[in-house]
Curated annotation (Swiss-Prot):
GO terms for biological process: leading strand elongation; regulation of DNA replication. Keywords: DNA replication, DNA-binding. One of its GO terms (molecular function) is DNA binding. It comes from Haloarcula marismortui (strain ATCC 43049 / DSM 3752 / JCM 8966 / VKM B-1809) (Halobacterium marismortui). Homotrimer. The subunits circularize to form a toroid; DNA passes through its center. Replication factor C (RFC) is required to load the toroid on the DNA. Gene3D superfamilies: 3.70.10.10. CDD domains: PCNA. PANTHER family: PROLIFERATING CELL NUCLEAR ANTIGEN. This is DNA polymerase sliding clamp. Sliding clamp subunit that acts as a moving platform for DNA processing. Responsible for tethering the catalytic subunit of DNA polymerase and other proteins to DNA during high-speed replication. Belongs to the PCNA family.
Amino acid sequence: MFNAIVSADTLQATLDSVSVLVDECKIHLEEDGLEIRAVDPANVGMVDLRLDAAAFESYETDGGLIGVNLSRLEDIAGMADAGQLVHLDLDEETRKLHISIDGLEYTLALIDPDSIRQEPDLPDLDLSANIVIEGKDIDRSVTAADMVSDHIALGVDATDELFYVDAEGDTDDVHLELTRDDLIDLTPGDAHSLFSLDYLKNMNKAIPKDAEVEMELGEEFPVKMHFSFAEGQGRVTYMLAPRIQSE
């Protein structure tokens, strides 16, 4: 059993955070909220999302697991204005999700969860540097790097206590530095890793510009990014594997 009412903007933010990496996912219906974990087909980008029951206008479930086509569900959610409420009701016999938006009625066929890619285990990494940065500064960094390259280096200089972004193209380069004063917080440790810009651009689309994003970095290690949405009642962790640089 699953029956819920949620604001369209909260639902859209939830779907956007996952759909930047995958087209379909499993949703765990827990009594205290929803949980989603997914990895892209290349095993490069992972997402771990939690949306508390308190983020909903109403939320009832006795637990369960459903599989959804994210693009179809996003299209339906996109029919609602930001302030409108979306009613979700699971028909367990037909394995369909009934969706109501201000008089519009949709019936979405669900996917067999067993046919969806296995969920990843996000490794517990001991990363040397930790920063807290505004979402708009991530957006600025990604936009600047995208002008010159398809890769982006993220790093922390522990001596100078700053976070930096490097992108090297065939002819042009971009370098951006943010000092301790520019950041919300900084726990310095030497870190430098190179990443695919395409993945970071996609993740950036889902990060609110006014969000406080905690970023964990190491030396040729994955980057982890954590942020909240839905007034703190939703939480997302992204993990992006690095491109290993040859000597």
